[in-house]
């Protein structure tokens, strides 16, 4: 991976994908002769807040919002700028990168301040978030060759999704065969820079061959009232584990606010949805992650992707439009095990997908649907195949 200019990594939620770039960035920051400046982009503002908290711990890296870089230029101190996809696609960011060498030389009177890594987390969204694809168009104008290395990470990007996602942003796509790095260096067609290289895929899920999320107990339950059942589950959780946290995924922004209003008498609640401003989303996410007294986070499906909370013990999903990627991302927040409930009203599971989108998950065995998504071999009849999800 070290010698490959562009890499994509698919690893199960909870694997520790952050450390795949965090440790190399710390090593780059420790170099005395050259200052490397890297950039990390995540899909949503909610995830941005979580990343800023995690990566800024222990003081090993100087971390700042990419908005600072876009508005003011490089400050001479920051090791890692963190932003969202909208920042990555912005003309102002593209222009800053294009003018990097001239700006650095004029401002700092040196050429020893260089662009390091471009890191994109949960990059499957470039292909699967159909309604946002027009927003990603500006990424194709970025000079990828200005960076020393590009790293694309996801817990839900099988080869077909990964290849399409990379091509969406103007890259070559995945390498079609295993290529030795010396072969890449010898190729006359790949001499222009990073964007000319096919991206090498590291599929850690297939290498492990185990169906992800087996550590989480997943229960599909038909109920008369989703909110009432969710309330019962939460009350039971906090009676047994009062220091724990829970996430509830609602189907609409209105439902988010209604649940937050009615549950405040029982729990300390934080709610987030897309109609809030960016600064408010960041503030509320930080409050839920860092304040041990906050118990329940309520939001639409985007609230779960990539967020990492140690005390989280339960995820409840009330949205019957979730596709398999959204399900995996939601369940994957339970890093050390826990309970995931999918609550559906009796005789009401009839969600439809929009054109171009992945279809909603089906009623039935969740493990089997996860296995099919990742292209793993079926082990029907073998002990352990359905641990934590069903008894079929």
From Swiss-Prot:
Function: Catalyzes DNA unwinding and is involved in telomerase-independent telomere maintenance.
Triggers of expression: Induced in absence of telomerase TLC1.
GO cellular component terms, semicolon-separated: nucleus
Family as reported in the entry's similarity comment: Belongs to the helicase family. Yeast subtelomeric Y' repeat subfamily.
Gene3D superfamilies: P-loop containing nucleotide triphosphate hydrolases
Key words, A-Z: ATP-binding, Helicase, Hydrolase, Isomerase, Nucleotide-binding
Official protein name in the record: Y' element ATP-dependent helicase YFL066C
SMART domains registered for this protein in UniProt: HELICc
Domain Helicase C-terminal: from-to ranges: 232-381
Signal peptide: none
Residues annotated to bind ATP: 11-18
Enzyme class: isomerase
Cysteines paired by S-S bonds: none
MF (Gene Ontology): ATP binding; ATP hydrolysis activity; helicase activity; nucleic acid binding
Enzyme Commission identifier(s): 5.6.2.-
SUPFAM superfamilies named in the record: P-loop containing nucleoside triphosphate hydrolases (SSF52540)
Helicase ATP-binding domain residues: 1-175
């Amino acid at each position: 991976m070290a010698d490959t200019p562009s890499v994509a990594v698919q690893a199960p939620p909870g694997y520790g994908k952050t450390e795949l770039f965090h440790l190399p960035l710390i090593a780059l920051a420790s170099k005395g002769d050259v200052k490397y400046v890297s950039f990390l982009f995540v899909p949503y503002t909610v995830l941005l807040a979580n990343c800023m908290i995690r990566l800024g711990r222990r003081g090993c890296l100087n971390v700042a919002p990419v908005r600072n870089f876009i508005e003011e230029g490089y400050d001479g101190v920051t090791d890692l700028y963190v932003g969202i996809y909208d920042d990555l696609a912005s003309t102002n960011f593209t222009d800053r990168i294009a003018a990097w060498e001239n700006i650095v030389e004029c401002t700092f009177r040196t050429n020893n301040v260089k662009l390091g890594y471009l890191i994109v987390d949960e990059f499957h969204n470039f292909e699967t978030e159909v309604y946002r694809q027009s927003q990603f168009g500006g990424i194709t104008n970025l000079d990828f060759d200005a960076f020393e290395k590009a790293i694309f990470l996801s817990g839900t990007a099988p080869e077909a999704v990964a290849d399409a996602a990379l091509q969406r942003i103007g890259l070559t796509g995945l390498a079609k065969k295993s290529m030795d790095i010396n072969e890449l260096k010898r190729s006359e067609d790949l001499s222009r820079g990073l964007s000319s290289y096919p991206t090498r895929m590291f599929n850690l899920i297939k290498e492990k061959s185990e169906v992800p999320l087996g550590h989480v107990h997943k229960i599909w339950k038909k109920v008369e009232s989703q909110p009432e059942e969710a309330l019962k589950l939460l009350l039971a959780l906090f009676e047994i584990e009062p220091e724990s946290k829970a996430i509830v995924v609602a189907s609409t922004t209105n439902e988010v606010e209604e649940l937050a209003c009615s549950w405040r008498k029982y729990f300390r609640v934080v709610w987030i949805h897309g109609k809030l401003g960016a600064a408010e989303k960041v503030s509320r996410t930080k409050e839920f992650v860092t304040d041990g007294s906050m118990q329940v986070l309520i939001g639409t499906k985007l609230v779960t992707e990539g967020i990492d909370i140690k005390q989280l013990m339960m995820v409840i999903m009330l949205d019957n439009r979730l596709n398999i990627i959204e399900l995996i991302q939601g369940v994957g927040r339970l890093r050390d095990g826990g309970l995931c409930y999918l609550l559906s009203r009796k005789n009401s599971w009839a969600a439809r997908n929009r054109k171009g989108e992945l279809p909603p998950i089906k009623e039935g065995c969740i493990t089997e649907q996860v296995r099919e998504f990742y292209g793993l071999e079926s082990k029907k009849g073998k002990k352990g195949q359905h641990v934590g999800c069903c008894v079929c």
